[in-house]
Amino acid sequence: MFFNTKHTTALCFVTCMAFSSSSIADIVISGTRVIYKSDQKSVNVRLENKGNNPLLVQSWLDTGDDNAEPGSITVPFTATPPVSRIDAKRGQTIKLMYTASTSLPKDRESVFWFNVLEVPPKPDAEKVANQSLLQLAFRTRIKLFYRPDGLKGNPSEAPLALKWFWSGSEGKASLRVTNPTPYYVSFSSGDLEASGKRYPIDVKMIAPFSDEVMKVNGLNGKANSAKVHFYAINDFGGAIEGNARL
């Protein structure tokens, strides 16, 4: 199993976020997220090797624990092929299929993570004789949202339906955010405007029909006439701008 490379390979975990790219790695995933609709038999994810060397690639899904080994994870999805070789400047399509081995909620989205681990080829023994060598295996993770058919509303409108409230204690400012929709809402950034200043918010993904508390950095206590500005992420990795008064 390529994931268990502890002695000769240093694993650098690279999380693929919106508006960023895994340019430090040679394998590039087409997109920043996967939307798997329940009426689809499968979804294809394209991988491209932008580097100059062939690479071995391992693909799998997890439930959110990025330290879990692929063999220990139980998810209702398969990734085919799980291991592949991608030559330089070539690509590979990974087929994701929902197996229904675990029943998922039908009234809301479910989230999983799609992983890609690229392992460089073994170096020529003669060229590296008597030399110290560090090989890096880069791992990229993006979210997979399983979306049941018939959910109410539109996922692009979910960020604008969020409810924002003051929270916090002992002089520390934070916000409680309620998501009344059946869709996950992810953010790229957010800040709070008060008294002519802006304070960064530690934004978090909010699950359907749930709350999250987000810290407001640099602000002590509540502020009058405050306004929240945020950028949420749509199905295509683009930005949805939103505002809310407190």
Curated annotation (Swiss-Prot):
UniProt-listed GO biological process terms: cell adhesion; cell wall organization; chaperone-mediated protein folding
What does UniProt give as the signal peptide span?
1-25
* UniProt cross-references to SUPFAM superfamilies, sorted A to Z: PapD-like, Periplasmic chaperone C-domain
Q: Keywords of this protein's UniProt record, alphabetized?
A: Chaperone, Fimbrium biogenesis, Immunoglobulin domain, Periplasm, Signal, Stress response
Q: Which Pfam families match?
A: PapD_C, PapD_N
InterPro entries per UniProt: Ig-like_fold (IPR013783), PapD-like_sf (IPR008962), Periplasmic_pilus_chap (IPR050643), Pili_assmbl_chap_C_dom_sf (IPR036316), Pili_assmbl_chaperone_bac (IPR001829), Pili_assmbl_chaperone_C (IPR016148), Pili_assmbl_chaperone_CS (IPR018046), Pili_assmbl_chaperone_N (IPR016147)
Keyword Iron (UniProt): no
Task: Recount the UniProt induction comment for this entry.
Answer: Repressed by H-NS. Induced by heat shock.
Q: Which domain of life is it from?
A: Bacteria
Protein function:
Part of the yadCKLM-htrE-yadVN fimbrial operon. Could contribute to adhesion to various surfaces in specific environmental niches.
The protein depicted here goes by the name Probable fimbrial chaperone YadV
**Native source species:** Escherichia coli (strain K12)
